[in-house]
């Protein structure tokens, strides 16, 4: 059914008064509303979505899902990247103001995509946007829907792609929103066993056609009306398995929902990126739906992330026992199209920040973090880093506070940031780091049997170049590490975590390292 209300105009607030089957009478926001009041208020607001005109037609025409191209993603929380010095207000920058601040930073630092934690309307700041009430409404915390369109348009103007996190698994339990909408379980499961998620939110009932249509429409809306370049689907393992628990079995109807949604999105938006945050080992996440897969373009490699961080937490004298943690990823790597994520989830809830996770004292943490990032960028797979990682922030992320930009006044952090900028530049410049990410001939182990010395060596290849990556994760110097390499007469140094020591040890090799009789001798400082 539908009705028309004479005199309704843009800017007016409204709610639906629902008389429930259980005898309740509750005022609800519009599930399909385009704009909302700022929390704690929750009325929907009539909004004219036809006023804004994008000027990014060239970008939209040329964009594509290029797995043979660099993809370097900077993940941010919109409200805490930077804050205004205004003690009487929230301190948020608007969508338009953030365009002027964030875009130059992304360009200067060498990131070509930004991923925004959920911007769909949500009542609780502490949920970070992952417990939604408005699946079609950008949060009013940072401005209007047209302000968000301005932000995306500005990013495209400066050749920055924009991804947004989308949450198709669950929704907030607030009574004014989707919960018990008509006095019964309308959007959610009626039974308690699967009705609520591990976060206390309501699980969507993906077996209902109306719920499927609602979520598929919402996903398409962000791509169509806001020109987002892709969506990162949150908590996919909680869709695949009942309550995210493999022991409870596959939720076949939710799996078919994912397939239908992804296929529909690909049919309408073939050049948009679909990315899965999935911690399970369910097969075929990035295989096409036609071939029986889930239809995502990329999947986060949570296994690589966990193994890598666990390795660098380990004291150097015990790393030989965990040597395999940095070789195991290549045992399964080609089963999916992976992104290597060091995301917001790794720097909260007492887990410690990336720099804090490194073994050793303050002085030892920095070189280890640098060489860990070099390993990340040399390893096959696209890259994702959360804000603050690039400046070696020691304080865990807090959505109420901006990043600790003041630490850049300290030489260690300033040099770390400079190196990360250089690393991003090296990554983008050299095709061997990204052209053959998902081709088995794009990677080859040279040496993965140096357990006692904590040395790893491998080769990355593209049509134009070969790059050899050598890592020493031990805390002692290796004066003459001999590495076998065939088919070349010399190696040119393109990047080192410690140029000064390398050049001091081999002043004659500042440009080239000679290969003699199929081998090269290299001085490896600690953590290099």
Describe every region a protein language model picked out.
Residues 37, 60-68, 77-228, 232-250, ...:
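Substrate-binding/active-site clefts of carbohydrate-active enzymes
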Residues 40, 227-229, 244-400, 428, ...:
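Conserved alpha/beta catalytic core and glycan-binding cleft of carbohydrate-active enzymes
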Residues 103, 107, 152, 219-223, ...:
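Non-transmembrane alpha-helical segments in soluble domains
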Residues 135, 139-143, 206, 248-250, ...:
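Short, contiguous acidic/charged loop-to-helix segments that flank catalytic cores in large enzymes
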